[in-house]
From Swiss-Prot:
It is a peripheral membrane protein. GO terms for biological process: proton motive force-driven plasma membrane ATP synthesis. InterPro entries: ATP_synth_F1_ATPase_gsu (IPR035968), ATP_synth_F1_gsu (IPR000131), ATP_synth_F1_gsu_CS (IPR023632). The lineage of its organism: Bacteria, Pseudomonadati, Pseudomonadota, Betaproteobacteria, Rhodocyclales. Signal peptide: none annotated. The gene is atpG. This is ATP synthase gamma chain. It comes from Azoarcus sp. (strain BH72). Produces ATP from ADP in the presence of a proton gradient across the membrane. The gamma chain is believed to be important in regulating ATPase activity and the flow of protons through the CF(0) complex.
């Protein structure tokens, strides 16, 4: 059995750890609320631009059809945008979305895909893709607590340009969708080509007046729409990250509290045994006299 001093040292160590996890839990709770606000604030923009894109995709613009709307007969070259976190200590958040990405890559290869290109958003996903030997064509890390579209556009544009130039047949995005504080789900969604289901039903049957040119308007709008989809995925992932971290740190704090209680019980038993032994020695010595 460990001595009383050793047990006290362990108790002190666990108490210090609990202080850290408790502080991280409180910080994550604060960041979670801000991340949820950013996520909700991005939704109206994405929804509005989606409706505009739906209307324009059905409008009468001569015979022009944007490459983002053209579906390929065979999908041989696939692009994957993997959204993860920069930091750990958030439970199985990254592991789950990475598993979804790997399973999807295996399915694409089984279906006849000859090339898979990856764009990684977040340090954890970037490191993971490098470890498994995936072809990473672009990445961005260290986004901080507030994602800025300017930092995302560059790496994402690599994938969009590849699709537009015919180098890719489809582009998918894998991220963690925020459901609520206690639940987050890994998602894999098709980004390109844009589908009718993704765009939704047009609001009306009337056409637009285009200035200066309809093709220019549609080109810019659809690119902005896809960028908005990626930004929304990143915002959802960040809200999920802070929620998962808060839950993980709370579990760690609760476990530390239980360990402290168990160690305190062992310490009390050890101390009681030492006192009993000392009293027995005193009584034995007195009897001998």
């Amino acid at each position: 059995m460990a001595s009383g001093k050793e047990i006290r040292t362990k108790i002190k160590s666990v108490q210090n750890t609990r202080k850290i996890t408790k502080a991280m839990e409180m910080v994550a709770a604060s960041k979670m609320r801000k991340a949820q606000d950013r996520m909700r604030a991005a939704r109206p923009y994405a929804d509005k631009i989606r409706r505009l894109a739906a209307n324009l995709s059905q409008a009468n613009v001569t015979d022009y059809k944007h490459p983002f709307l053209v579906r390929k007969d065979q999908v041989k070259r696939v692009g994957l945008i993997l959204v993860t976190t920069d930091k750990g200590l958030c439970g199985g958040l990254n592991t789950n979305v990475q598993r979804v990405a790997v399973n999807a890559m295996k399915e694409w290869e089984a279906a006849g895909a000859t090339e898979i290109r990856a764009c990684c958003i977040g340090n954890k996903g970037f490191g993971f893709m490098q470890r498994i030997g995936a072809k990473v064509v672009s990445h961005v890390t260290q986004l901080g607590d507030t994602p800025h579209l300017e930092k995302l556009i560059g790496p994402v544009k690599v994938m969009l340009d590849a699709f537009q130039n015919g180098e890719l047949d489809a582009v998918y995005v894998a991220y963690t969708r925020f459901i609520n504080t206690m639940k987050q789900e890994p998602q894999l969604e098709q980004l390109l080509p844009l589908t009718g289901e993704k765009l939704g039903t047009p609001d009306n049957s009337w056409d637009y007046l285009y200035e200066p040119d309809p093709q220019v308007v549609i080109d810019e709008l659809l690119v902005r729409y896809v960028e908005a989809l990626v930004y929304q995925a990143v915002a959802e992932n960040m809200a999920s990250e802070q929620s998962a971290r808060m839950v993980a740190m709370k579990a760690a704090s609760d476990n530390a509290k239980n360990v402290i209680g168990e160690l305190q019980l062992v310490y009390n038993k050890t101390r009681q045994a030492a006192i009993t032994k000392e009293l027995s020695e005193i009584v034995g010595g007195a009897a001998a006299v």
